[in-house]
Regions:
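Catalytic-domain carbohydrate-binding cleft regions of carbohydrate-active enzymes
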Residues: 1-274, 279-280
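Solvent-exposed, conformationally flexible loop/turn segments
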Residues: 236-238, 263, 377-386
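Accessory, solvent-exposed terminal regions and/or long lumenal/extracellular loops of proteins
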Residues: 279-381
């Protein structure tokens, strides 16, 4: 009960101090009911290891199953000293074992309700991990860029979490309860209504480092046997990873647009640049432009990625971004519907208004077969034939 009362006190008193900014609470303590304050719980100061990364997936899913949708982890793990050559020398930024772990954790964190890189012992800033054109650096930057591009999808999902009792990270059996193969799948999950996330939680390019804890020093990780230079790794190798595609839907590989039938496992491409990601057929996936921070650009160009194979619905939510005016009705909803038989997308009239909302915007409608159409939207209903 103490975490609930503490978080509630922070929320109440901070809003009393300044109601023009939304309260932001990050906590490792949790009690039932805490979701009413929008507090985000993280999994604690976990070790930087593949074992820890594997455990984060079911941990996050179990947390959301309690009714609290807001959960995240320290990307890369918190205690990473075992990857350094010597205590505090930060050499782990060049250690291929940590580089691979950090990259895959970043690709998992991309699909957490909060994406947050944090830890000790090793610098986490991306510029320590190479330069543009180098595989690890490009993979890390690519994950961050995709997070920002997904903001229209994530923010709209957050609206559904708030008013529709939804969740960001969904255990597969929540959406595919008739498929027994999803019941104990603790390595994959749905992120929002459309994205099947398949994080790579095993090393594919390096050997797994077993991280142990010295009982005499507690959190100080030991067991580093690195001497001399780090071994060379060819990050351009083709790798694959086993993925289960739930029955009851067809699936598109997000990266290749190849279509698969659900109900079986496949070996999906898993290069260092990205982890396997699939989109459910019958989805509308809105994405924004490249941005450096969430409010850098208004949503004047939104790409609507259509994935045919079934009818689809999506409601795009938007508001002023950082205040409580939405509680007074200052927000907009743009319902969208895809008719698969007619190959038509209907974008309904905008509902609501808020200060600074775009007077018009462009929806770039795309399909996996490469078709693309730009549609000027002024708030009135429009139908697009694809």
């Amino acid at each position: 009960l103490f975490p609930l009362m503490t978080v509630g006190g922070v929320d109440t008193h901070q809003r009393a101090e300044d109601s023009t900014k939304r309260v932001f609470i990050l906590t490792r303590s949790f009690f039932a009911g805490q979701q009413r304050y929008g507090a985000n719980t993280w999994s604690g100061d976990v070790a930087s290891s593949w074992e820890s990364l594997r455990n984060q997936v079911p941990l996050c899913l179990n947390h959301t199953l309690t009714g609290n949708p807001n959960v995240n982890t320290d990307i890369g793990g918190f205690f990473a000293g075992a990857y350094n050559r010597a205590w505090g020398d930060n050499s782990a930024v060049s250690n291929p074992q940590f580089r691979e772990l950090y990259t895959r954790w970043m690709q998992f964190g991309l699909f957490n309700p909060m994406m947050r890189s944090h830890g000790t012992d090793v610098y986490r800033e991306l510029y320590y991990y190479g330069q543009p054109g180098e595989p690890v650096y490009d993979a890390l930057v690519g994950a961050v860029k995709m997070r920002y591009r997904l903001l229209p999808y994530i923010y709209s999902t957050a609206y559904n979490v708030s008013v529709g009792d939804g969740s960001f990270m969904r255990a597969l059996f929540m959406d595919f309860k008739d498929d027994k193969n999803t019941w104990d799948n603790n390595r994959q999950f749905m992120f929002g209504p459309s994205l099947l996330v398949c994080p790579v939680v095993d090393p594919l390019f390096t050997e797994e480092k077993i991280v142990r804890t010295d009982e005499t020093s507690g959190w100080n990780k030991v067991g580093n046997d690195a001497v001399g230079g780090w071994p060379a790794v060819d990050w351009t190798q083709d790798k694959t990873y086993d993925v289960y595609l739930p029955a009851g839907a067809d699936w598109y590989d997000y990266w290749t647009n190849e279509k698969y039938t659900g109900g079986h496992s496949i070996s999906a491409p898993a290069p260092i640049s990205h982890s396997p990601l699939f989109v459910k057929a019958g989805s509308i996936l809105p994405m924004g432009e490249d941005m450096q921070y969430s409010g850098e650009k208004p949503w004047e160009l939104v790409t609507l990625n259509l994935y045919p194979g079934a009818d689809a619905e999506f409601t795009l939510y938007e508001d002023e971004g950082d205040n409580y005016n939405y509680l007074d009705g200052k927000f907009t909803l743009i319902p969208m519907r895809w008719n698969d038989r007619r190959r038509e997308l209907t974008i309904d009239a905008v509902k609501g208004a808020f200060d600074g909302m775009p007077a018009e915007r462009t929806f770039r409608v795309t399909t996996p077969d490469g078709k693309s159409r730009d549609v000027k939207y002024t708030g009135k209903r429009v139908t697009v034939k694809m």
